[in-house]
Amino acid sequence: MKKYYFSTLLLVVFLLIPLTVFADEKDTKNGSHPYDMVNSKGEVIKYEDYMKELDTSSLKKDENYNGSGKILPERKLPNYKKYKPYKSLSPSVPSGAIQKSITPYVVIGEDGRRVVDDTSVSPFKQISYIELEWADSWGWCTGTLIGKDTVLTNGHCVVDPDTQQGITGAYVIPGLNNSHYSYGAYQVVDYFVPSQWINTGDSSQDFAVLKLAPYIGENAGDVAGYRPIRQVTNIANQTVKVYGYPSDRINDAGTYSQWGMSGTVGREDTSLAFYQLDTFNGQSGSAMLNSSNEIVGVHRGGYTFSDGQSFNGGPKMIKPVYDFIKAAQ
């Protein structure tokens, strides 16, 4: 994460405490921007500030890195399940500008998902299980490593715009398979979400970048590798794959493994892509991967259109999303 000047909204001692209401951000006359960046401490990094930094620096080319593959011992993780109830992380309703209804998940017709047998190969090695702790519950999402210590996921996985509260803790486990893992488990120490996600729950803003601490001296991306992000405009009729950790399949099997499938982007608008790939709660935050395994969007949930058709979908990697993610890295 590059250095920027912060507009501090509240002072806290520890990272990853619940966020509070950001009333000032709702007034665009005060100079706020939908892609202003808010971190886990409630500090705001203004859009114009990080864009100046991006404009004056040479952005590194997004490259695929498969990681060292170093085998690390499993670590003792907090047992959230023992003390707190499970929280189904359902996306909020969209903004008034998006006339679609949204559900947490959709299995469309016959379930076409398959289990991933080998998560030691890319891109499955970079797809990660994220276990989340809230003040009164726990849950999980999916994310994808995009740098040595950064993960891309959904905004609703870390901040609930209805309550304005954030997670109190989280761990990221790359390549979790049959409830075992080889590449370490990494504590989330910070996160970055768009201010408009906190203020409105806008579907097109439902993404987040997580920052990870090293585990026994190793960074997650150095060990498991990371996926490149690809800026896009139109991806209709392109093939994408969406893999993650769906709760229905995990509960049926009794073990945590990756599931997913490939298909075609059937509809899109300027900021969202829609496809009839089957997903379920727990796959929130999964990457939309193109045929080159580049990230072109972030899966969010199920959408039902006014014509009655059901799709899954989420934010595309349009320029402001791409810029936000690059700045957060």
Where are these regions (language model features)?
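Cytochrome P450 catalytic-core helices
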Residues: 149, 153
